[in-house]
Each structure stands twice: as structure tokens, then as C-alpha cells.
Amino acid sequence: IEMHLHRIEGLAEEYLYFNDDMFPVGHCVQTDFFRDGKGVIGMYRHLLSPNMYKKICRISDQVGRRLAGKRSALTFMRPQHICSPMLKSVCTQVYDSNVPEIRQTAECRSRTEKNLCQYVYLDYMYHKGLIIPEKISNRHFSVALASADRLKDFLKNPDTKLVCINDVKL
């Protein structure tokens, strides 16, 4: 689903993709996420891809690099795990490039380590200079580790703009 949001009729050119574990909790303004026609999000370089999530991130970066006309690299970029600032026209351009990995992901009934994710759009944007690599104000909580009281205290008095409440250890 996340790979197809840009196809929603009437969707704005600049839109935010929120995964089901991301929530705005503080005052946010458009410039937190978009400036001068570019998305704003932290981007991090990784070398190893030991799990399915990181393997998907690696493939998404490889496709984004290739479409941006960049050489492959030993490392890969992973966007900050927070809402994603998307540019509809760029997502459409990448999606319409008809690369095999996009078709294979669309045809797959369940996620595998050979799939892409919506990060392919952010990776392409990054490699084309359409990302301002700046960390978005956020906090992460894992329900596997954080106490209910700690989470409640944060939600009553947040010190960041966004929060990720995840069901896995981050």
C-alpha cells in the first residue's frame, strides 16, 4: 500500500506518509518536513544488512541510486524511522520507471527480503539532491521495553514533535 499512495487522486504534491506507529504529539509546521521543494528527513549510512528490514532498505537504496544515475555502493542509505516527506511527482516518476523490482514488489503477496519499500522514493530523492538531510524531532518507544508509565508521562508532556510507538525493539 505504501508504494501506491502517490496514485491517490487529488493528493497534494507534498505529502507525509505516516506508518501505523508514528504520531504527531507536538506542534508541527510544514517547514519541519518540506523546504524549498525538498523533503526534510535524517538519512543514515549503513554497511551491514543483517535482517529482512535492512535488506529491504539496501535494495531500495540500490534502486534509488540506479534511477538517479549514481553508481552502486558498498554502503546504503536508510531514512530516519519517522514519517516520510514525499513529493508526489517524484514518486510517480520512480514508480513509472517500471523497474523490475517495483513490479516484483507489487506482485508479491507478503513482504520478503527481496522487496522494496517506500524508502525507494526517499532514496531516489536523496541521491537527486531533493532531501535536506536533517533529523526530524522525534522519540521512539518500544512497547517491549518501555513501561506504560514512562510512555504515559511522555504523552502527557512531550518534548518532541513526533513519536514512534513500536511493537519491536529499536
Q: Which residue stretches match the model-derived regions?
A:
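Residues that form generic nucleotide/phosphate-binding pockets
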Residues: H4, R66, Q93-V94, Y124, ...
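Long, low-complexity C-terminal extensions of enzymes
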Residues: T112, C117-L170
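Generic recognition of flexible, low-complexity loop/linker segments
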Residues: H4-L5, A106-S110, R150-K152
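Short beta-strand-to-loop acidic/aromatic patch adjacent to the donor-nucleotide binding site
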Residues: A12-V25
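Conserved glycosyltransferase catalytic-site signature
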Residues: I1-E2, M22, K114-Y119
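Long, charge-rich alpha-helical interaction segments
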Residues: F34-N115
